[in-house]
């Protein structure tokens, strides 16, 4: 069973967070990391250390695992074809989701499948979105379906 999980990491100035190997995308919602500024994202699959800048950082982190997690902001079981190649893709304020994933409202409010979601509230994709809000999401797409559309970050994953 594959799970996609979203975490919200609130890092104090200079604080570090060690991450185990595994497919992930990190998005800096505010502040900065040593190598990434607010509004930017990065894909990674190796061990990593996130280090907050002088003002700290709020980091949204999506991780793909083969198990369930209890400590995530939101976790969703994702059915994937074990024989297909996939990629994790991070996008902001895009149209319909190209695959299953998890989104997070950054500013404003969105109505997601009839439910009001406020800033830093999370939702499972695909979903029907309406309202005046800004969001970021990570979706899983088949590698052959990656198009030229702009992504904040993306990378191949191996199941």
Provide a role label for each language-model segment.
Residues 1-22, 62-101, 143-145:
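A short glycine-rich, His/Asp/Glu-containing loop-to-beta-strand
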Residues 2-5, 55-73, 124, 133-155:
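A short hydrophobic beta-strand segment most commonly corresponding to one strand
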Residues 9, 17, 26, 34, ...:
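Residue "hotspots" at secondary-structure boundaries inside conserved domains
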Residues 21-34, 98-111:
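Short, conserved beta-strand element in jelly-roll/cupin
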Residues 22-25, 56-57, 99-102, 119-120, ...:
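Short, surface-exposed beta-edge/turn micro-motifs
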Residues 27, 39-40, 91, 135-138:
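Intrinsically disordered, low-complexity linker/propeptide segments enriched in Ser/Thr/Gly/Pro
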Residues 32-50, 111-129:
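Short acidic-glycine-tyrosine-enriched beta hairpin
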Residues 157-159:
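Cys/His-clustered metal-coordination modules, chiefly Zn-binding fingers
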